[in-house]
Amino acid sequence: MSGNNSNDLAQGLKQRHVTMLSIAGVIGAGLFVGSGHAIAAAGPAVLLAYAAAGTLVVLVMRMLGEMAIASPDTGSFSTYADRAIGRWAGFTIGWLYWWFWVLVIPLEANAAAAILHAWFPSVDLWAFSLLITLALTLTNLCSVKNYGEFEFWFALLKVLAIIGFIVVGCIAMFGFVPSSQVSGASHLFDTQGFMPNGLGAVLAAMLTTMFSFMGTEIVTIAAAESKDPGKQISRATNSVIWRICLFYLVSIFLVVALVPWNDPALAEVGSYQTVLSRIGVPNAKLIVDIVVLVAVTSCLNSALYTSSRMLFSLSKRGDAPAIAQRTTKAATPHVAVLLSTAAAFLCVFANYVAPAQVFEFLLASSGAIALLVYLVIAVSQLRMRSQREARGEKIAFKMWLFPGLTWATIAFIVAVLAVMALREDHRAEIIATALLSIGVVAAGLLVHRKREAAGKVALDN
């Protein structure tokens, strides 16, 4: 079975592309650099924050897997929300998700450009940013195979980097590196205990870490452009547990075991660079910079791919301009790619010409979109599963302990959103995301009413 929205696109992704994408889809710059801020806030108890956020992602991916295996579709959860909840839900979450990845494009381009500018200071920052964005846009315009090939090698480098870090970290922890400044695991408890800043700090860290997992769901979008999407999605969903445990929990455990959580370097230069420097690895900064460059370039590549596919899917359903449906001879949605890139450039332009508050609002508006996506996936699975069971369909891939665990997941997401609204450091994100969501819902209702009215007029004539 395959969804309607994926039929017009090429099935150019090979098994190794989807496999590597699923393995490394959760690895971003947030792990290599951003995790240092979470550790500095929560101490060793940040492990609990990552475990809680990781558990949520595992449950959401299981729900998404149940729907995607039954009906693979380029629109993924947006299409399922359309079917299970209503047109307004699919319209809203589809556009919010597109907006999230459009914002990611300039942010990741600037992050990559900053690293390259540090190596080659004679070249302006904007030139590197423009060059990287245009190069990856051209790559995505050619064929989906190009995206898959780039992501395969990006993902392989990220995986090798983490495995290398874990191996070096374990060797140092067991005292087999004579030149190392750190060894053992005493820092888990010897600096004001395991939870030095209390449960509130762990909760705050969980809110931060939760967004580092955004991108896990991309495999369900990409798999629709492979020859056996159901099989690919099943593999990706079943492997998400060990991926999160290995890449996040094990690597973060090594960081908090080897380095005191209150070491200023964690927040200043990042967790990986701090640990490698303390172990005595030569050129630790250069090594981490290369890995981060690969990670942010990979994220930029995925942002271009994901935003274009979501826009294409919205267009196929009549929820976006019809021109976004157009494809090349290689069955690539080139107009959707160009429109997404153009929107990203408009965001950059707004940063320069609009008041600072405008761009701050644009950034804040994406703050809670990840949680809204997870919430929509859970509600869609709850309703779609009930609908399928009522029709007597055989469900090959099931969410565990349905419906109890689905309801528990929904309650947890709502609770996290409520906590974000109560905390001053996250309230702006909730307000901005809520305002944007209301605007998108209103636009969707207006579009659908006009379409229904036009349809009635056509029937009357």
Predicted regions and their residues:
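Extracellular loop-to-transmembrane helix junctions
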Residues: 10, 23, 33-128, 132, ...
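Helix-loop-helix junctions that connect adjacent transmembrane segments
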Residues: 3-9, 46-47, 121-124, 156-289
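Membrane-interface "cap" regions at the ends of multi-pass membrane proteins
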Residues: 1-35, 40-45, 58-62, 74, ...
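TM-loop-TM module centered on a large, flexible mid-protein loop between adjacent transmembrane helices
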Residues: 79-81, 86, 118, 205, ...
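Hydrophobic alpha-helical segments of multi-pass membrane transport proteins
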Residues: 139, 161-165, 311, 364-395, ...
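Membrane-helix boundary/coupling elements in multi-pass transport proteins
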Residues: 73, 96-110, 213-226, 248, ...
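C-terminal membrane-solvent junction of multi-pass transporters and transport-like membrane proteins
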Residues: 153-154, 323-334, 371-428, 460-461
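Membrane-interface loop-to-helix entry segments
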Residues: 126-183, 214, 237-241, 363-376, ...
